[in-house]
From Swiss-Prot:
The lineage of its organism: Eukaryota, Fungi, Dikarya, Ascomycota, Saccharomycotina. Changing N126A: Loss of catalytic activity. This is 5-methyltetrahydropteroyltriglutamate--homocysteine methyltransferase. GO terms for biological process: 'de novo' L-methionine biosynthetic process; cellular response to heat; L-methionine biosynthetic process from L-homoserine via O-acetyl-L-homoserine; methionine biosynthetic process; methionine metabolic process; methylation; symbiont-mediated perturbation of host immune response. Its EC number is 2.1.1.14. PANTHER family: 5-METHYLTETRAHYDROPTEROYLTRIGLUTAMATE--HOMOCYSTEINE METHYLTRANSFERASE. Pfam families: Meth_synt_1, Meth_synt_2. One of its GO terms (cellular component) is hyphal cell wall. Zn(2+) binds at H657, C659, E679, C739. It is an enzyme of class 2 (transferase). Binds 1 zinc ion per subunit.
Amino acid sequence: MVQSSVLGFPRIGGQRELKKITEAYWSGKATVEELLAKGKELREHNWKLQQKAGVDIIPSNDFSYYDQVLDLSLLFNAIPERYTKFDLAPIDVLFAMGRGLQKKATETQAAVDVTALEMVKWFDSNYHYVRPTFSHSTEFKLNTAAGIKPVDEFNEAKALGVQTRPVILGPVSYLYLGKADKDSLDLEPISLLPKILPVYKELLQKLKEAGAEQVQIDEPVLVLDLPEAVQSKFKEAYDALVGADVPELILTTYFGDVRPNLKAIENLPVAGFHFDFVRVPEQLDEVASILKDGQTLSAGVVDGRNIWKTDFAKASAVVQKAIEKVGKDKVVVATSSSLLHTPVDLESETKLDAVIKDWFSFATQKLDEVVVIAKNVSGEDVSKQLEANAASIKARSESSITNDPKVQERLTTINEALATRKAAFPERLTEQKAKYNLPLFPTTTIGSFPQTKDIRINRNKFAKGQITAEEYEAFINKEIETVVRFQEEIGLDVLVHGEPERNDMVQYFGEQLNGFAFTTNGWVQSYGSRYVRPPIIVGDVSRPKAMTVKESVYAQSITSKPMKGMLTGPVTILRWSFPRDDVSGKIQALQLGLALRDEVNDLEGAGITVIQVDEPAIREGLPLRAGKERSDYLNWAAQSFRVATSGVENSTQIHSHFCYSDLDPNHIKALDADVVSIEFSKKDDPNYIQEFSEYPNHIGLGLFDIHSPRIPSKQEFVSRIEEILKVYPASKFWVNPDCGLKTRGWPEVKESLTNMVEAAKEFRAKY
């Protein structure tokens, strides 16, 4: 009998219960006991759901109140000293590391003011992890102040009658994905391996004592280009960890091709391996060849990253091939990765078109898929499920919903001229200086302003038909005016309208484009309590009418200052949607580029001549390995942006924005935007600024962290700008936050932006 396995399940709850209780706790409206009780309830639901579905190997320790990598940092005492000074409870230390903390002094507690650790993309997904941060003084040990999470949750499931397989990020990946703290920049995190291995060993021993038979130990860095010095660390690590006193270890990889690093793991004494055969089915032969007698092969054939139904025939064929290689008793049918990246349950979608809905599979449905495939390759009768699945796959492939001949014809018109501005940047800059007459250190924001409760209530009322379109438009215009007047009052130079009409920077556009489908409850965790509801690209994309012109024109009409039109770029819309799996990413991005070109041209025609096209996801789409696939991606990603933005006059200023990523200036240069803004506030490495010293166009390196409620002082802004100006010329530098202000409250936004503008004014006086 071939077993079924799931690598992880969404932690957020079917109705976003985790977000609600976490934010209630942060705001003082829920106790820590209520927070912990809700977490326990969510874990129990997930375990019971998987047990009921018939999944054989059920994960534990896949739950987190914020981020699973951050959990490990807390557990292993990798806590920078600045978070240990305030006598905080363990859960509050966790949240302070994840989002920063600023509290006024009370009679019983000193004031707290700490910034968050850096948050970066989890490989090429839209999930973000909190980056482990190490120093020479880091002392690894099991931090048992709040228990031992992997052991406690294993025992919790065991008490419910559910035998689970704990999930832990492996030591090589944990260190390699971390960074040196600002006081230890000469430290190579991987050099800490000998210090951390005894702590891993102790944790594994405690899991064995609790009754764990296997542990899923994730080493996803194996899909990256690893230096030989890092490759050699796997043998060192697993020779030290494996033994009779610890559970069996299943070394787990996902998101890519392991073959270039195969030598690093071919002789490891682990009980088995997991590989992603959704992303790289062609690696099966080579990875199977390294298995020794007794080692199992976990075959990731159900996509943990997308929402399309698994083709049972194709997936079963892959598993059957694995069985032929290593034997039926040594193969496990599994999800390709954790299901963290998919919505919880398709059954909660009551408004989806029935035809389209039949093409989808969310996390709950994927449980059934791994079970059916396992039964099928084991010889059990699942003919009804196979027939229904085949019919669904066939219907989608033949549907007219996916094909628009006009869009396909327009794609053929794209050439280099269409994707090139009328003049090079120096000539454009001359015209833009004459037109806008901006001061040195021009100030702006990235786009969104706080999405208040009042905004959400009125948007909901409009969606339900409780207020008219005229009433809703009047409300939105009032919100826009509030944002504009505030920006004028504090002296910002280039304004935004605040985006009160937008629910999400991708969904808002997807809802107005042909070729998209939408969910009502298809939430996925992006980071912490930030969840997104990605649109689904189901067919060829086009723009039937203008999407943003009305609000931008109104905003410009009430101010004499330049007003930015705000759009989300083609690659970001693609990356932050669930994409089609039947056509290439390049085709989808270029279709989006053409649709956005129409919008950019309409904005310019309506008098909006500063236009920002955000591409925060362009880095995350970069293939994980160097080579032709990566260079091809960079070419079509930049081309799709230029297709969108190259139809304007020289005097129209094109901006773009990037966040959550380590960026190569050459990637940005290829976009040929006039001004770019980049998340920067949590970058501690001075070399990162140096990389942009030769960037030819204008740039704004983000000066404060919008993911944290913490308010930076004017002096903090001044110090940050001084550091940047040691490397980057004042004549090209813009002053702005890291990202949009949607998730922040008005009081912190007002104070932070006021301090930022005052700092810019101080530098104008100096220069």
